[in-house]
């Protein structure tokens, strides 16, 4: 492997420097170059190129398991351990996210709180039976941008979203309106969120009631009651927003849109649905 590294990088640094740094002889390296390459070596190079393409297509966010499922989808026969080995050789590692918190300037309205009807049952037998919702924040040079989303637990597809400079009832209402517009009039639908004032507001509760949607809310201070929604926002931040600096809110809006509609929904592999993307899962279920 040291000789392969030297061969790959000798166009950048002299081979004798690399040999010295890695503790191998120049004679051994040049003898290795003259040897015919093994079938395994050629195969590793071909698979390694495909692995790198998958990793870069995910904007450097995929770990070995998701890359592996990309390879299987392309018809490449290889095991997970081989993917891990070839990713290590190329130093392909998903980047961790940074964390920054906005001040709590949300609306404060006294309203009835719904029981936790969902009760951590994060699976749905059909679409438009269980929607989960929440909002998060993205830092820009102009200030915070708040992002609300609605996810269908059947396919993990983001069916509604909205973005605003303020975390108001209108923010979460707009996300639900988009979901209803996109999926059609709901029937026997459960909507789950936390107990934030935006979701307990009269405006939002009236929208649920007008469409006959059953309201469910997490218990106070219990993030695990909406863990699937937390998982989506963690992916959004880890895979996109936390690694970037946005000059304007419009720039952030465009990037969040790109992540949701051009990557997450149509392409991102999700472990909960057999490493398919949400839209691919819906296609296989005959919904798209």
Where do the protein language model's features map onto the residues?
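Charged DNA-binding/catalytic regions of mobile-element recombinases
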Residues: 1-288
């Amino acid at each position: 492997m040291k000789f392969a590294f030297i061969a790959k990088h000798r166009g950048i640094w002299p081979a004798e420097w690399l040999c010295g740094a890695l503790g191998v002889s120049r004679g051994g390296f040049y003898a290795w170059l003259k040897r015919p390459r093994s079938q395994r070596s050629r195969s590793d190079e071909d698979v390694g190129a495909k692995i790198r393409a998958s990793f870069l297509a995910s904007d450097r966010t995929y770990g070995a398991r998701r890359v592996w499922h990309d390879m299987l989808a392309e018809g490449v026969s290889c095991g997970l351990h081989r993917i891990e080995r070839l990713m290590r050789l190329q130093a392909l590692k998903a980047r961790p996210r940074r964390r920054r918190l906005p001040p709590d300037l949300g609306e404060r309205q006294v309203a009835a709180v719904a029981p936790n009807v969902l009760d951590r049952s994060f699976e749905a037998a059909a679409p438009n039976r269980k929607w989960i919702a929440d909002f998060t924040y993205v830092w820009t040079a102009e200030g915070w941008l708040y992002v609300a989303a609605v996810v269908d637990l059947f396919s993990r597809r983001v069916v509604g979203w909205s973005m605003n400079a303020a975390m108001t009832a209108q923010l979460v209402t707009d996300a639900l309106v988009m979901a209803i517009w996109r999926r059609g009039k709901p029937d026997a639908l459960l909507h789950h969120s936390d107990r934030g004032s935006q979701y307990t507001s009269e405006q939002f509760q009236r929208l649920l009631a007008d469409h006959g949607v059953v309201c469910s809310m997490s218990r106070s201070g219990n993030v695990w009651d909406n863990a699937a929604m937390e998982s989506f926002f963690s992916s959004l931040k880890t895979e996109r927003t936390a690694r970037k600096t946005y000059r304007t809110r419009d720039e952030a809006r465009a990037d969040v849109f790109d992540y949701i509609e051009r990557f997450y929904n149509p392409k991102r592999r999700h472990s909960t649905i057999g490493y398919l993307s949400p839209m691919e899962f819906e296609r296989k279920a005959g919904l798209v």
